[in-house]
Design a protein with these regions (language model features):
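Charged, alpha-helix-forming regions
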Residues: 1-408
Length: 408
């Protein structure tokens, strides 16, 4: 049976009426549900929500003004971006621009049917547009309601569509969880073998401080007021926001040769190892990466080019393995933003075996890297494929005959 014939069989010849969303739903402003506290903590129990990608901003211990979605689920809708979420648990709201949307009559229109249909609409958000979208736009959009004159039949059709999409959603979430678990297992396995390979008995090899292993470079920020430093720049200017990868060959920002010549930032040769030395991320991890191209750094970064007879890949793997130890030894105490004490960083010691042993270790770890990276790269692709498959069937289930008067 084809997908279209399934929808036709589901409708079984019934009439479909396209009704304005504002006629079948109602909304509530979030005023009495807005969170007052600014500090959230994972030990608290009430989620603080936004309709955007972040969704759960944190947790609060406030006990008043809780929206009880556990009793009656709700759609939260961002009045500016049109982002929306299905919520079936109690929460506090963060933004006054959020609307809580519910069905006018649960005996005629299933709210989750509305939610799934709402997500078939293309985003109309425009950067800088501060127009309130629900009243001026979305409440007037028309949603297909099968046989509205027969609520029992209508709810049966809506329920079947919701059931199918719930199943697709659950399967997609299950697959994502399985792939993520596989990736985490591979990473743990890789970290274990890496740490074993980079562990040496006392006296077995020479130990050097990080300051002794190579030439270190600092970073700087060319003046933002000089357009000639930034416009049409071609030299990577790496900052902590670029350090989500272990191999870096591009950056979010680029600068010009003039900026290198006339500012505190310096051009660093290719095949350096960069680390973040000032960022809130240092409260959790020490980001490090192999920089494959000539590049510059901002002032929150440092990079090293190892001396002769010390392989860059060996130092890259070693810093990755010793990241937690380096943080414990060199992170400054106090201060509004976490940072690394350069003197303590440069005095941190690591084992440096002969170059043949370095090469052996690097070859083994590179093989593990290749395996882990293939899974890391494949995971988003597989998830994206499943999401597109889900969206295809979702849109198909809502492909009701549309009269010419409906222009959604």
């Amino acid at each position: 049976m084809s997908e279209m014939s399934y929808l036709e069989k589901l409708l079984d010849g019934v009439e479909v009426e396209w009704l304005p969303l504002g006629e079948i739903t109602k909304y509530e402003q979030p005023t009495k549900y807005l969170v007052k506290a600014k500090d959230y903590h994972d030990t608290y129990t009430i989620p603080v929500l936004t309709a955007g990608k972040t969704f759960i901003l944190g947790y609060t211990n406030e006990t008043h003004g809780i929206y009880q979605a556990s009793k009656a689920p709700v759609i939260i809708f961002d009045d500016f971006t049109t982002a929306n979420k299905w919520v079936d648990f109690d929460f506090k709201a963060k933004s006054s621009a959020m609307k809580m949307v519910t069905s006018c009559d649960d005996n005629k229109t299933l709210l989750k049917y509305v939610y799934y249909w709402l997500n078939t609409l293309p985003s109309e958000f425009a950067e800088g547009d501060h127009k309130r979208q629900w009243i001026s736009n979305y409440s007037q959009k028309k949603i297909p309601i099968p046989c509205p004159d027969n609520p029992e039949k209508s709810l049966a059709i809506q329920s079947e569509i919701v059931r199918i999409l719930d199943k697709f959603t659950a399967l997609t979430a299950e697959l994502t969880a399985e792939l993520t678990a596989e990736l985490n297992m591979r990473k743990k396995q890789y970290n274990y073998y890496r740490d074993q390979l980079l562990s040496f008995k006392e006296g077995e090899v020479e130990w050097k401080t990080l300051g002794e292993i190579g030439k270190w470079y600092g970073g700087g920020t060319p003046s933002k007021n000089k357009i000639e430093f930034w416009e049409n720049g071609s030299i990577p200017w790496i900052s902590p926001k670029d350090m989500g990868r272990t191999l870096v060959d591009s950056s979010e920002d680029y600068i010009t040769e003039e900026a290198v010549l006339q500012s505190s930032t310096k051009l660093i040769p290719a095949n350096s190892i960069a680390i973040v030395v000032r960022s809130s991320i240092l409260d959790k991890v020490l980001p490090s990466a192999l920089i494959k191209v000539p590049a510059t750094l901002n002032q929150d970064m440092k990079a090293v080019i190892p001396h002769e007879n010390i392989l860059v890949k060996y130092i890259y793997h070693m810093i990755g393995s010793r990241g937690s130890d380096i943080l414990r030894a060199a992170k400054k105490t106090g201060g509004s933003v976490a940072s690394i004490d350069s003197k303590k960083l440069f005095s941190f010691k690591i084992p440096v075996p002969n170059i043949n042993e370095q090469q052996r270790i690097v070859e083994i770890l590179d093989k593990f890297d290749t395996l882990t990276n293939s899974i890391t790269e494949g995971l988003p692709r597989e998830i994206e494929l499943r999401q597109k498959q889900y969206e295809y069937y979702r849109d198909l289930l809502f492909s009701f005959p549309k009269p010419e008067t409906v222009s959604n």
